[in-house]
């Protein structure tokens, strides 16, 4: 009898801890909504809130017109765990801070360890936005090139920008080539791209142009549909989200 009671208390404690963690993660999502970091769409997985789906849209510099899918992986003990969240791109991305073997983005220079209550996911997304807008500055901020995830990309950026730009364009083209691939998961929160269809998407585009919004995806988490489904519809050949910004 005592063992049953102890087991029940343990289960209740675990349930409360899970609920508390879910609340913290939801709070992170709400903060991302309020910050409105342009050009980045994210949403937690329906099946596992520790995994987030994201899409990055480059709007300037070397990465202008880029579309990169990525995942955010939170540690099991988030946000108390001092381990920083992991950002992993789905395709190869040429950048000094992106490992060419694992496609993971190194954020340790800005977030050496996770400080609960001080560090937030919207700051990670903002950092991501900044280092893609100016990769050369991110090299300077790191200091030693040997600490960079992609030393070769760093050397090219500082010595032969044309060659670096060419490699970046190759990675952008590769990513765009897979934009309409069948989703690797059945998770309903996975961000899906649909080819532009005038009869379906035309009215939505017209509403946006006229200043009226509809239930659309969350740009940096910003205000998805009530069901939590997240989708982005892009005009064929443009790869730009149908958003007001």
Curated annotation (Swiss-Prot):
SMART domains recorded: UBCc (SM00212)
Ranges of residues in domain UBC core: 20-177
UniProt-listed Gene3D superfamilies: Ubiquitin Conjugating Enzyme
Taxonomy, superkingdom: Eukaryota
Pfam families: UQ_con
CDD domains the record matches: UEV_AKTIP
InterPro entries (UniProt xref): UBQ-conjugat_E2_core (IPR000608), UBQ-conjugating_enzyme/RWD (IPR016135)
Similarity comment text for this entry: Belongs to the ubiquitin-conjugating enzyme family. FTS subfamily.
Protein name: Protein crossbronx
Organism of provenance: Drosophila mojavensis
């Amino acid at each position: 009898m005592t063992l049953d009671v102890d087991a029940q208390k343990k289960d209740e404690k675990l349930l409360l801890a899970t609920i508390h963690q879910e609340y913290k993660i939801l709070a992170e999502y709400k903060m991302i909504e309020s910050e409105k970091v342009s050009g980045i769409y994210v949403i937690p997985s329906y099946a596992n809130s520790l995994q987030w789906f994201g899409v990055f849209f480059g709007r300037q510099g070397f990465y202008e017109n880029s579309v990169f899918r990525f995942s955010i992986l939170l540690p099991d003990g988030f946000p108390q765990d001092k381990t920083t969240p992991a950002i992993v791109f789905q395709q190869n991305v040429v950048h000094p801070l992106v490992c060419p073997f694992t496609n993971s983005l190194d954020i340790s220079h800005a977030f050496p360890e996770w400080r609960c209550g001080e560090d937030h996911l919207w700051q990670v997304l903002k950092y991501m936005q900044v280092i893609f807008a100016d990769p050369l500055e991110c090299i300077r901020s790191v200091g030693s090139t040997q600490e960079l995830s992609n030393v070769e990309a760093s050397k090219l950026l500082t010595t032969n920008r044309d060659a670096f730009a060419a490699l970046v364009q190759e990675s952008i083209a590769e990513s765009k080539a897979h934009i309409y691939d069948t989703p690797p998961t059945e998770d309903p929160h996975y961000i899906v791209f649909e080819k532009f269809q005038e009869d379906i998407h035309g009215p939505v585009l017209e509403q946006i142009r006229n200043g009226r919004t509809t239930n659309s995806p969350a740009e940096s988490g910003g205000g998805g549909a009530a069901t939590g489904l997240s989708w982005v519809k892009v005009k064929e050949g443009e790869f730009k989200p149908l958003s007001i910004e």
